[in-house]
From Swiss-Prot:
InterPro entries: DNA-dir_RNA_pol_omega, Pol_omega/Rpo6/RPB6. It catalyses: RNA(n) + a ribonucleoside 5'-triphosphate = RNA(n+1) + diphosphate. It comes from Synechococcus sp. (strain WH7803). GO terms for molecular function: DNA binding; DNA-directed RNA polymerase activity. GO terms for cellular component: DNA-directed RNA polymerase complex. In cyanobacteria the RNAP catalytic core is composed of 2 alpha, 1 beta, 1 beta', 1 gamma and 1 omega subunit. When a sigma factor is associated with the core the holoenzyme is formed, which can initiate transcription. Pfam families: RNA_pol_Rpb6. Disulfide bonds: none annotated. This is DNA-directed RNA polymerase subunit omega. GO terms for biological process: DNA-templated transcription.
């Protein structure tokens, strides 16, 4: 995960990968926005300690990881 900062090239590649592998770009964008909104409220509530990473950046990384490694998901 991201701790001290953001590798912008890696973030761009992850975002492009999410869009490229999706069947619907709009729904992917909505998923990213929804996840970012959740992370923003988690930050506000003090549940997350990684406040140096913006919620949208964190959402892209999380969704990209879920897409690339589906075996890590519970269930």
């Amino acid at each position: 995960m991201l701790t001290a900062g953001v590798d912008h090239q890696d973030l761009a590649k992850r975002g492009e990968s999410l869009i490229r592998q999706s069947s619907n770009r709009y729904l992917t964008t909505v998923r990213i926005a929804f996840r970012a909104k959740q992370r923003r409220f988690d930050d506000f509530d003090g549940l997350l300690e990684e406040s140096s990473v913006k919620p949208v950046q964190r959402a892209i990384v999380e969704l990209s990881d879920e897409q690339d490694q589906p075996d890590l998901l519970p269930g």
